[in-house]
């Protein structure tokens, strides 16, 4: 985010939440240019005039859209997914299934307790938690959080990862 029509040269950085929402409460009334870099077909750019409380919906096109649902049977979580590239020219090279005991779930090693990699754009990924060391090691955290775990699908498309929404499950 860059102030416009001022002498400011530094960007005002802000980050989106896992669900894509964002909030920046450290802005002055001013004109800004917003440039969002991410796993999008092209950078998302918008101009906005901030006057008091201002809302701006940024629109970006991901390389792939991912739908996912989860079913729990005992200590097995089955995630059914479908990856749809936004262009037939885009290569989906890998699909990842993740689970975590905290609501943050992505490809970062701190944001996953388990990960499986497949190559199919549509299918299922099964997490057998009963036989999962990370599940056993973190069972006290999971039980302290109402037996919730969180799952998500990621798809590596054109070298970047787009994600499904995070699904909360109870095991």
Label each PLM-derived region with a short phrase.
Residues 1, 85-111:
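Solvent-exposed loop/turn segments flanking beta-strands in beta-repeat/beta-sandwich domains
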Residues 4-19:
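Short, acidic Ser/Thr/Gly-rich low-complexity loop/linker segments typical of extracellular
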Residues 20-24, 28-41:
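A short, solvent-exposed beta-strand micro-motif common in secreted/extracellular proteins
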Residues 20-22, 54-56, 121-129, 138:
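Short strand-edge motifs at loop-to-beta-strand transitions and within beta-strands
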Residues 29, 39, 129-163, 171:
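Beta-strand-rich modules
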Residues 38-63:
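Structured interaction patches on ligand/partner-binding surfaces of diverse proteins
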Residues 62-70:
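Proline-enriched interdomain boundary motifs that mark the N-terminal boundary
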Residues 75-79:
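Structural beta-strand segments of beta-rich domains
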């Amino acid at each position: 985010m860059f102030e416009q029509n001022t002498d400011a040269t530094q960007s005002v950085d802000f980050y989106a939440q896992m669900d894509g929402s964002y909030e920046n409460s450290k802005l002055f009334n001013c004109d800004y240019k917003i440039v969002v870099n991410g796993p999008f077909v092209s950078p998302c750019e918008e101009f906005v005039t901030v006057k008091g409380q201002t809302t701006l919906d940024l629109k970006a096109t991901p390389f792939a859209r991912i739908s996912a649902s989860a079913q729990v049977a005992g200590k097995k979580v089955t995630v059914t997914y479908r990856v749809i590239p936004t262009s037939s020219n885009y290569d989906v090279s890998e699909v990842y299934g993740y689970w975590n005991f905290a609501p943050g779930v992505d490809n970062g090693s701190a944001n996953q307790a388990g990960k499986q990699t497949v190559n199919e754009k549509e299918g299922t990924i099964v997490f057998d938690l009963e036989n999962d060391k990370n599940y056993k090691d973190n069972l006290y955290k999971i039980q302290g959080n109402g037996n919730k775990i969180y799952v998500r699908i990621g798809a590596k498309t054109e070298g970047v990862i787009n994600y499904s929404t995070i699904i909360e499950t109870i095991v």
